[in-house]
Amino acid sequence: MTQTLRTKNLKPLVFVVVLTALVSRADIASESLPPALLGSAGPLQGETLNYYGNAAGYLVAPEGQGPHGSVILIHEWNGLTDRVREVADAMATEGYIALAADLYSGRTGSNPRENMALVRETLADPGTLIANLDAAARYLNARHDSTGKVATIGWCYGGGVALSFALGGVEHQATAIFYGRLLDDPEQLKRIDHEIYGTFAGQDRSISVDAVNRFVTALRSAGVPNDVHIYDSVNHGFWLHVDANPEVRSAPALDAWNRLKRYLARTIGS
């Protein structure tokens, strides 16, 4: 496979650390950010979808007959929340059928202890996780308004699950990982047959810069094309929670969003 690594500068590091100076923090903070970043688009537009067992997913489709590409959104460690549903709405506005998956069978955690219990319970049964996402992908592919092209997008816990799905799930065309757990074994990564998108945080204490560099090195060794960036001034969870520190998080979150839109356009765009 011909490698088309999209990281901008390969000297001397495996990949570039993207500075928030790409865009002025003050300029971004004073502007209206897109709803995908702040969840400010108003009432939710979608509906609950029971697509697998007790999974209560959230489905929203764009206007028009299509056909449209599809995205599966995979939640953070606390479960499927309205914040992820808001991103699904934003994806529909961009022209994609969006299904926010539910990997916790309708449950959400309200504190770190509950969140970690849900993470451990579900990661202990990876077959069920993959079956859940397989069902989501098959549902999307079977829709009359679907192009049959599917991407997964996951944050934190969901980012790691998205990578696992890229290794062992039904056919899909794109995987976007936001600060999720990684692998650095080229032999395993050779099973991926599509470009990988990655957004990571330079101040992340759980997914280190070294870990991300090893991941990119392994992707390159495996011949997997990728668009992976680290944003140096932010920490874990920044993209879904810009409002917690907008002065610092707005610029990198907006850059990551624009990269994601370009990635989806070239991988699943109709």
Give residue spans per PLM region:
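A conserved short beta-strand
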Residues: 171-181
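Short beta-strand/loop motif that positions the catalytic acidic residue
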Residues: 198-200
